[in-house]
């Protein structure tokens, strides 16, 4: 069992079930986001840093028929056109989210542990990014048929952006912040499969 899944199990046991743990995680996030001195969830107005998880509001993009107004994004390297790019974790089933973050944690465990000590403990902005690229993410998600979850985000359409510390990946996995417009995850996945089979 991976580290993120272990932490989710511990949070679920402490809360008296996974549903209660999810409610507690969402309450923790909203409280932390508003707290001025809180660093585990920290305001971040700049571009994405790879390997970090961001939550933000996203306005209707002109070029997209469907979009998520409240993405939870595991950041990748910047797109060639200059947009931020990442995996919208809201689009993934819980098991796939857990598998993905466990996979990344296992790959970078020593590095992440180094970023969660001393002054960097629970300090999302101070923690250094990971070298996690589009190529690696795409290979992983293709195994599940969910590489459509890799999205681009224009800086001008993002607002209220915060970054979450590595120590709290398990909590953010439990949160359900999806606000999908003009479609459903099932419809998007079906359309994506149809596109791949052309």
Residue ranges and their predicted role:
Residues 55-58:
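A generic structural signal for residues embedded in beta-strands
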Residues 29, 67-68, 170:
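Short linear interaction motif-like sites in intrinsically disordered regions of transcription factors
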Residues 26, 64-65, 167:
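Short, low-complexity intrinsically disordered segments
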Residues 3-53:
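Mixed-charge, Lys/Arg-rich low-complexity intrinsically disordered regions
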């Amino acid at each position: 069992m991976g580290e993120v899944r272990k932490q989710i199990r511990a949070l679920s046991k402490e809360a008296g079930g996974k549903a209660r743990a999810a409610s507690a995680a969402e309450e923790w996030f909203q409280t932390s986001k508003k707290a001025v001195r809180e660093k585990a969830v920290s305001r971040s107005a700049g571009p994405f840093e790879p390997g970090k998880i961001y939550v933000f509001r996203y306005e209707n993009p002109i070029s997209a028929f469907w979009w998520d107004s409240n993405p939870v994004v595991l950041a990748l390297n910047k797109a060639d056109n200059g947009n931020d790019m990442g995996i919208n974790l809201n689009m993934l089933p819980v098991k796939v989210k857990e598998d993905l973050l466990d996979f990344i944690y296992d790959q970078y465990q020593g590095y992440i542990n180094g970023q969660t000590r001393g002054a960097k403990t629970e300090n999302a902005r101070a923690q250094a990014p990971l070298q996690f690229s589009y190529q690696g993410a795409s290979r992983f998600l293709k195994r599940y048929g969910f590489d459509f979850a890799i999205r681009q985000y224009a800086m001008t359409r993002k607002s209220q952006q915060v970054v979450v510390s590595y120590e709290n990946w398990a909590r953010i996995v439990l949160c359900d912040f999806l606000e999908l417009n003009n479609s459903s995850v099932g419809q998007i996945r079906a359309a994506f499969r149809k596109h791949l089979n052309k």
